[in-house]
UniProtKB/Swiss-Prot annotation:
Its EC number is 6.1.1.19. Belongs to the class-I aminoacyl-tRNA synthetase family. InterPro entries: Arg-tRNA-ligase, Arg-tRNA-synth_N, Arg-tRNA-synth_N_sf, ArgRS_core, DALR_anticod-bd, Rossmann-like_a/b/a_fold, tRNAsynth_Ia_anticodon-bd. Its main location: cytoplasm. It comes from Streptococcus pyogenes serotype M4 (strain MGAS10750). This is Arginine--tRNA ligase. Monomer. GO terms for molecular function: arginine-tRNA ligase activity; ATP binding. Pfam families: Arg_tRNA_synt_N, DALR_1, tRNA-synt_1d.
Length: 563
């Protein structure tokens, strides 16, 4: 139990008028440590108990069991709690040393499934930095949910259907070179895609021709289907090579095309429930009672189904297949209206499990302040960017540690980790400007900074030849050790907050705080001095490294033992 929860539970025993959660939220950290570690303001009880806050604080301080604390004192309207630092540090260190990487493992999920719709790049288009956010946020959440006791199911809902394939077929038939596409599939397909879009801006017949080819594809035309399958196969080979570099795996690659034969059932269900309304020849579902002004367009006047119809089919399939406890869609914030409609239509259909669906939205990545666009050819391609990040990491490692063994593997861990960490430390609803130099820096709030703190601790433990014993009692009470102990003790709560808020930046910021606290401790403490505190300090180092490594793992970032 963390100290805040402990204090809240002790206060709740003597204040039945307040729920423990309410007490927890009222606890404050005094600005001056001389006033204790945590304080409870009694103002909120004044009306209920009809007494002055000062009197309430004084009376309650007398009633609270002090055995868990160094002391409990009333100061004005506050009850100040002084924690027994030696006792708590001993408990925390024992927990980490005993559990190792399983420290803070939780059982909220009880093995239930969480479906995570993530990454989902478009076939025949390059994997750009724009897709990175969905990929790394989804991957981190998968690790977090597993730590909370859920079974994550990572779904790559590939963009392998739609009018863009009509455009691409038109472009390929006009200008395509089979040998060139086979040699460099994504590069060639991107050139064709950008060129046909540029032509479509001045020639309206291009759109008509593309729509016709896409209709042929929907009808199973042999030539259209063969071209589509070829574009898909070549793109997937390229994507999987990139996923390997990012150390990201998936449980399903069922994309948009997978649901082609599953949409009729959606239409039948909507018709059976009398939810479809005709509007200008199209079929829609009105959602005004959910506060959604625009109806959900299910089927166009030409008979073509839409994105939402496909997502309804996917939601039904996933519930039947995985019986998920949660279903999350890691998709850009520009799709917010779509996901509101999706949930509302499912609610209208009578599916209560739609409450378990969450749109995990995120902001845009820009470059030099400009929005990225595949159609206009303004993209940052991931593959060369990852290669450059690895090279930058390798240069810094060479300068810091020229004799390091396995330099290539470490440079890969640092370069890829730098890109992932920078993305994840940004509150997901915020965008960020892509700047590789800042990302790969060993200074500042970066992945390499946190990785280097972990590697530094491993170096100390190697020099000391220290392995902690689960049967030995380790204890520390100095101020800088205490800052680290408090963070380590808070790790289970950080994991839960990250999970509850679908917000990996909470975990990334925790990792930065822990690395900074350790570096401050390292600068002011002679850890390896042969005195009575040596083993206690080394046990703290061991626990810090264990939690840092696990925090990075939960972000999908490796923690090298040497850098």
């Amino acid at each position: 139990m963390d100290t805040k929860t402990l204090i809240a539970s002790e206060i709740a025993k003597v204040v039945p008028e307040l729920e423990q959660d309410a007490i927890f939220n009222l606890l404050e950290t005094p600005k001056n440590s001389d006033m204790g570690d945590l304080a409870f303001p009694a103002f909120s009880l004044a009306k209920v108990l009809r007494k002055a806050p000062q009197m309430i604080a004084s009376e309650l301080a007398e009633q609270i069991d002090e055995s868990q604390f160094e002391k409990v004192v009333a100061v004005g309207p506050y009850i100040n709690f002084f924690l027994d630092k030696a006792k708590i540090s001993s408990q925390v260190l024992e927990q980490v040393i005993t559990a190792g990487s399983d420290y803070a493992q939780q059982d909220e999920g009880q093995g239930r499934n969480v479906a995570i719709d993530m990454s989902s790049p478009n076939i025949a288009k390059p994997f750009s930095i724009g897709h990175l956010r969905s990929t790394v946020i989804g991957d981190s959440l998968a690790h977090i949910f597993a730590k909370m006791g859920y079974q994550p199911v990572k779904i790559n809902h590939l963009g392998d259907w739609g009018k863009q394939f009509g455009m691409l077929i038109v472009a390929y038939k006009k200008w395509g070179d089979e040998a060139a596409v086979q040699a460099h599939p994504i590069d060639e397909l991107l050139k064709l895609y950008v060129r046909i879009n540029a032509e479509a801006e001045t020639d309206p017949t291009v759109d008509e021709e593309a729509r016709e080819w896409f209709r042929k594809l929907e009808d199973g035309d042999k030539e259209a289907t063969e071209l589509w399958q070829w574009f898909r196969d070549e793109s997937l080979l390229e994507f999987n090579r990139l996923y390997d570099q990012l150390h990201v795996t998936f449980d399903s690659y069922n994309g948009e095309a997978f649901y082609n034969d599953k949409m009729d059932e959606v239409l039948e269900l909507l018709e059976a429930k009398n939810l479809l309304v005709e509007s200008k020849g199209a079929q829609v579902v009105n959602l005004e009672k959910y506060g959604i002004e625009h109806p959900a367009l299910i089927k166009k006047s030409d008979g073509a189904t839409l994105y939402i119809t496909r997502d309804l089919a996917a939601a039904l399939y996933r519930k039947r297949t995985y019986d998920f406890a949660k279903s999350v869609y890691v998709v850009g914030n520009e799709q917010a209206a779509h996901f509101k409609q999706l949930k509302a239509v499912l609610q209208e259909m009578g599916y209560d499990w739609s409450d378990d669906m969450t749109h995990v939205a995120f902001g845009l990545v820009t470059k030099g302040g400009a929005k990225l666009s595949t159609r206009k050819g303004n993209v940052i391609l991931l593959e060369p960017t990852v290669a450059e990040a690895i090279n930058r990491a390798a240069s810094q490692i060479e300068a810091k540690n020229p004799n390091l063994a396995d330099k290539e593997a470490v440079a890969h861990a640092v370069g890829v980790g730098a890109i992932k960490f920078y993305d994840l430390k940004t509150d997901r609803m915020n965008g960020y400007d892509f700047d590789l130099e800042t990302m790969v820096s060993f200074e500042g709030e970066t992945g390499p900074y946190v990785q280097y703190a972990h590697a530094r601790i491993q170096s100390i433990l190697r020099k000391a030849d220290f392995t902690p014993s689960a049967t030995t009692t380790y204890s520390l009470a100095d101020a800088e050790s205490w800052e680290i102990i408090k963070l380590i003790q808070d790790f289970p709560r950080i994991i839960k907050r990250t999970s509850d808020n679908f917000e990996p930046s909470i975990m990334a910021k925790f990792a930065i705080n822990l690395a900074q606290s350790f570096n401050k401790y390292y600068a002011h403490t002679r850890i390896l001095d042969d005195n009575s505190e040596r083993d206690n300090r080394l046990a703290l180092c061991y626990a810090t490294a264990t939690v840092l490594k696990e925090a990075l793992r939960l972000l999908g970032v490796d923690a090298p033992n040497e850098m």
